[in-house]
C-alpha cells in the first residue's frame, strides 16, 4: 500500500502542489544571512506541534525541524510527511476560515493565499527544489522526528526569508480523524490518495532571530530505520526564542481574519 502511495504522490502534477517553477540552483547573494525560527502550529486540528530553524550563511542553509504528534502510520506503514518552505504570498498560516469549500479541511491549495507556493523542499536527500515537493520517498516519516540538513538555498527562498514571507509547512493528516464531509474526498494533488494525505498539518512563519541565534537543543537526530521516527529534544533556551517568533506569527495571522 505504501508503494502505491509513493507512486501516486510522485506522479502528482507539480503545479497542483504549488510549485514556483524556478529551479533549485543555489543563490549567489547573501542578503538573507542570519538565523530564522518559528513555532510550528497545528493546521486542520492535527494536534501536532513543532519548531523550525533556518540558518543561512552565504548561499547555504542549515534547516532543523522538530515535530511531534503527527500522523504515525498510513496503511500500516510509517506515514511520510512532505515538508517545504513556502514563499511568495502573505507569509502567514491558514486558518479554518480559509476552508473555501466547507468540507472541514484546509487543503494545500486553499492554504496557498496565506503561505504561497513551494520555494524549497525539505527532503532527507537529493533534490531540494520545488519539483521534489511530492516525493514521499525522501520525506521524514512517523509521528515525531528531528530533521536536519545543510544545502544550497535557491534565490527565491532567500528573497522570501529576507522579505519576511518564508513559511515552513509540514503536510499529512490522519485520514481516520477527518470530518465526515472530507473523509471520502480524494486529494486535489494526487487523486489516488485521500485528501488528508497531502493537506497541511503544521505551519509556521519564519522570523529572523537576534544576532547570535540560539542553541537548538537538538541532542539526537536519529531516524529510525523501521518506524521512521526520531527522538526529539526541545531546549529551553530555544523554546523561548522560538516563542517570540510564534507571538509575531500569531499577530500576523490574526491580522488576516
What are these regions (language model features)?
Residues 2-7, 12-253:
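N-terminal leader/targeting pre-sequences
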